[in-house]
Curated annotation (Swiss-Prot):
GO biological process, one term: translation
The name this protein goes by in its record: Large ribosomal subunit protein uL29
InterPro entries reported for this sequence: Ribosomal_uL29, Ribosomal_uL29_sf
The species this protein was found in: Borrelia garinii subsp. bavariensis (strain ATCC BAA-2496 / DSM 23469 / PBi) (Borreliella bavariensis)
GO molecular function, a single term: structural constituent of ribosome
Gene name of this polypeptide: rpmC
Highest taxon of the lineage: Bacteria
Keyword list, A-Z: Ribonucleoprotein, Ribosomal protein
């Protein structure tokens, strides 16, 4: 998934992060109710959010070029 994030612009990454956060919240609610098809999806989404946060922070600090 990281390779696909490298081609995103900063605005695209922030939008994708917001989308993943909403999807993660949905999965959390579904897991409480007990209707989750793939319980490992929650972990994958959480890790993708962390990857995006890292890349966004690198752009803001100037470590990674736009």
């Amino acid at each position: 998934m990281l390779k696909s994030f490298k081609n995103f612009t900063l605005e695209d990454m922030k939008a994708k992060r917001l989308e993943l956060k909403k999807e993660y919240l949905d999965l959390r609610f579904k897991s409480i109710v007990g209707h989750v098809e793939n319980p490992l999806k929650k972990r994958e989404i959480r890790r993708d959010i962390a990857r995006l946060n890292t890349i966004i922070c690198e752009y803001e600090l100037g470590i990674r070029k736009v």
